[in-house]
Amino acid sequence: MVPKLFTSQICLLLLLGLMGVEGSLHARPPQFTRAQWFAIQHISLNPPRCTIAMRVINNYRWRCKNQNTFLRTTFANVVNVCGNQSIRCPHNRTLNNCHQSRFRVPLLHCDLINPGAQNISNCRYADRPGRRFYVVACDNRDPRDSPRYPVVPVHLDATI
């Protein structure tokens, strides 16, 4: 009985540890506000090819992100979208703080093509340029954000 209890406790600890690691892989780096991390991940007027552009994000995450979209617009333009009518977020249906752009913007979507890469310097991506509408979730700014924008984008929910 004691070995079974001990084994089950170790399994539980391992499972909780793995869940913590998995959760941390999706978390933003603590030195950034949600709006700052949004800008790093999704705003670039002229992104280089995906493999190069994704290095910045992957260096903070310590792993190869499966996919990402860069909007070829300014942060101020995305902030303006936060002023559009609120809608239910298409991919996070529990959220009602999303807003859809009124105009298509050029974008660059990046897809990881070697998911087994063990080192972030080996992450390789396929480039998929396009022109689409986008949906962002917006929240009140963090005290660490610029007071210039009281409401800021914090999540790219969809491109349409």
UniProtKB/Swiss-Prot annotation:
Nuclease among keywords: yes
Gene Ontology, cellular component aspect: extracellular space
Primary localization: secreted
Pfam families: RnaseA
Top-level enzyme category: hydrolase
3'-nitrotyrosine modification, residue list: 60
A single GO molecular function term of this UniProt record: nucleic acid binding
Keyword check for Signal: yes
Superkingdom, natural source: Eukaryota
Chain residues that bind substrate: 65-69
Gene Ontology annotations of biological process type: chemotaxis; defense response to Gram-positive bacterium; innate immune response in mucosa
Function: Cytotoxin and helminthotoxin with low-efficiency ribonuclease activity. Possesses a wide variety of biological activities. Exhibits antibacterial activity.
Quaternary context: Interacts with bacterial lipopolysaccharide (LPS) and lipoteichoic acid (LTA). In vitro interacts with phospholipid bilayers.
Similarity field: Belongs to the pancreatic ribonuclease family.
Protein's recorded name: Eosinophil cationic protein
Species for this entry: Pan troglodytes
The organism's taxonomic lineage, starting at the top: Eukaryota, Metazoa, Chordata, Craniata, Vertebrata
Gene: RNASE3
